[in-house]
């Protein structure tokens, strides 16, 4: 009897070990649309350790470091190399430029509190020049607007203003936002964040939505994952514990949202 118990214990442990190391995406091959989105959400949440807002400074100094200039971070939109010590609020007088923590999915839509996990999620919070962060504000993503050279982006005017990052940033920004849209499905694991959705319209401050889904889907398809994006992803995963499935498997985006946008 003891031998049988030992054998059963060994088999259970072996199966657990295999499942723990298996490709988490292998079981998704037959899923599409909403079912696939739900399954990808579970993968995106796996291992997530919420960061403090203070921790984000050091995480971004690592994740957004400039590989060609030691001691600098690279802005998510501007692609400007900024001295890492020139942080907003603590930068010495010698700093000509300052950077802060840009929420690519604006925190005013809809996770303004620091105890909400999306507020400190480094998979979509990135280094950026203070001015470019301010100019982006809470704008939806779309094509068009006045070119802002220092931010390498375009910004519209008026109530329906939008933000268009440069081609160098479009794919990465799209995959960051897709991650947020699947990761946060209405607090299933106590992350204190509402269900966040990408939509095909302009959005208002305070609502848990961001536009424009179909523009982002096109950007994600047109601008593939770069080595810089892979390196950033790996750094965030080391600190935070979870992964962005759209960096690992960019094809998932079309399988989740392609029919909504008629993108092949």
Model regions and ranges:
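Mature, extracytoplasmic segments of signal peptide-bearing proteins
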Residues: 4, 18-20
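Bacterial N-terminal signal peptides
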Residues: 7-16
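A generic structural signal for short, solvent-exposed coil/turn residues
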Residues: 14, 67-68, 93, 238
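N-terminal module-boundary/linker segments of secreted carbohydrate-active enzymes
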Residues: 20-81, 255-264
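Short, His- and charge-rich active-site/binding loops that engage polyanionic ligands
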Residues: 73-75, 80-98
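Domain-level detector of nuclease and nuclease-like folds
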Residues: 90-264
């Amino acid at each position: 009897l003891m031998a049988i118990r030992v054998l059963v214990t060994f088999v259970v442990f072996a199966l657990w070990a295999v499942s723990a190391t298996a490709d988490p995406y292998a079981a998704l091959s037959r899923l599409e649309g909403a079912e696939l989105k739900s399954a990808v959400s579970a993968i995106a949440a796996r291992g997530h350790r919420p960061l403090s807002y203070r921790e984000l400074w050091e995480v971004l100094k690592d994740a957004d470091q400039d590989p060609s200039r030691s001691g600098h971070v690279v802005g998510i939109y501007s692609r400007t190399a900024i001295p890492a010590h020139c942080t907003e609020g603590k930068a010495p007088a010698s700093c000509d430029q300052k950077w802060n923590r840009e929420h690519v999915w604006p925190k005013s839509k809809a996770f303004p509190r620091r105890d909400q996990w999306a507020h400190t999620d480094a998979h979509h919070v990135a280094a950026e020049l203070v001015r470019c962060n301010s100019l982006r504000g809470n704008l939806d993503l779309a094509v068009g607007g006045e070119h802002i050279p220092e931010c390498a982006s375009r910004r519209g005017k008026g109530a329906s203003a939008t933000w268009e990052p440069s081609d160098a940033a479009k794919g990465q920004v799209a995959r960051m936002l897709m991650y947020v849209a699947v990761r946060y499905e209405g607090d299933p694991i106590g992350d204190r964040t509402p269900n966040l959705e990408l939509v095909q319209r302009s959005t208002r401050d305070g609502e848990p939505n961001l536009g424009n889904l179909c523009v982002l889907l096109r950007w994600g398809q047109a601008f593939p994952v770069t080595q810089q994006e892979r390196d950033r992803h790996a750094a965030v995963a080391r600190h935070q514990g979870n992964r962005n499935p759209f960096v690992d498997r960019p094809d998932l985006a079309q399988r989740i949202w392609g029919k909504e946008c008629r993108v092949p």
